[in-house]
């Protein structure tokens, strides 16, 4: 299975890079992982709604360029569905069983995802009603993908 994580912005913090590297290494046993970072647009202070939408559209166009036609796209969105880790593993397994060998997870920037990206998504997922820094969220997503594969393989993993 091929897993892509397409995210706005670059990781600068060493501790986050180390965590991403660790989960990437762990996941190599289960899938081919591709992490893609697209450029984040600078948001001016006191940006209008129109300016924010323009920024989201620019970031969205960069994201869409990296989504393959055959990808099952999971957009991480505050308005998405909240599910358990077991349900998440079932979602990944269902992709595999229905012939979707490529899953693209999409993480927006500080303003979220554009309507075009949300429209392309096959599934909208929310981890919480809380807002997280998108850099930290990559680690959280990788941990849950790793946990999902452990669940699917019937392997133990701490709770």
Swiss-Prot record:
<comment type="similarity">
    <text>Belongs to the RNA methyltransferase RlmH family.</text>
</comment>
<keyword id="KW-0698">rRNA processing</keyword>
<comment type="subunit">
    <text>Homodimer.</text>
</comment>
<protein>
    <recommendedName>
        <fullName>Ribosomal RNA large subunit methyltransferase H</fullName>
        <ecNumber>2.1.1.177</ecNumber>
    </recommendedName>
</protein>
<dbReference type="GO" id="GO:0005737">
    <property type="term" value="C:cytoplasm"/>
</dbReference>
<feature type="binding site">
    <location>
        <position position="76"/>
    </location>
    <ligand>
        <name>S-adenosyl-L-methionine</name>
    </ligand>
</feature>
<feature type="binding site">
    <location>
        <begin position="127"/>
        <end position="132"/>
    </location>
    <ligand>
        <name>S-adenosyl-L-methionine</name>
    </ligand>
</feature>
<feature type="binding site">
    <location>
        <position position="108"/>
    </location>
    <ligand>
        <name>S-adenosyl-L-methionine</name>
    </ligand>
</feature>
<keyword id="KW-0808">Transferase</keyword>
<comment type="function">
    <text>Specifically methylates the pseudouridine at position 1915 (m3Psi1915) in 23S rRNA.</text>
</comment>
<dbReference type="InterPro" id="IPR029028">
    <property type="entry name" value="Alpha/beta_knot_MTases"/>
</dbReference>
<dbReference type="Pfam" id="PF02590">
    <property type="entry name" value="SPOUT_MTase"/>
</dbReference>
<dbReference type="GO" id="GO:0070038">
    <property type="term" value="F:rRNA (pseudouridine-N3-)-methyltransferase activity"/>
</dbReference>
<dbReference type="InterPro" id="IPR029026">
    <property type="entry name" value="tRNA_m1G_MTases_N"/>
</dbReference>
<dbReference type="InterPro" id="IPR003742">
    <property type="entry name" value="RlmH-like"/>
</dbReference>
<keyword id="KW-0489">Methyltransferase</keyword>
<keyword id="KW-0963">Cytoplasm</keyword>
<keyword id="KW-0949">S-adenosyl-L-methionine</keyword>
């Amino acid at each position: 299975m091929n897993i892509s994580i397409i995210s706005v912005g670059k990781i600068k913090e060493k501790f986050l890079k180390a965590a991403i590297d660790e989960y990437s290494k762990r996941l190599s046993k289960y899938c081919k992982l591709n992490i893609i970072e697209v450029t984040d647009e600078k948001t001016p202070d006191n940006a209008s709604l129109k300016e924010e939408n323009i920024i989201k559209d620019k970031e969205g166009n960069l994201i869409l360029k990296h989504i393959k036609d055959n990808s099952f796209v999971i957009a991480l969105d505050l308005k998405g569905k909240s599910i358990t880790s077991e349900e998440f593993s079932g979602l990944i397994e269902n992709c595999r069983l229905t012939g979707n060998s490529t899953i693209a997870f999409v993480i927006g920037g500080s303003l979220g995802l554009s309507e075009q990206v949300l429209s392309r998504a096959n599934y909208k997922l929310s981890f919480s009603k809380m807002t997280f820094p998108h850099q930290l969220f990559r680690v959280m997503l990788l941990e849950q993908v790793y946990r999902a594969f452990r669940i699917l393989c019937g392997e133990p993993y701490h709770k």
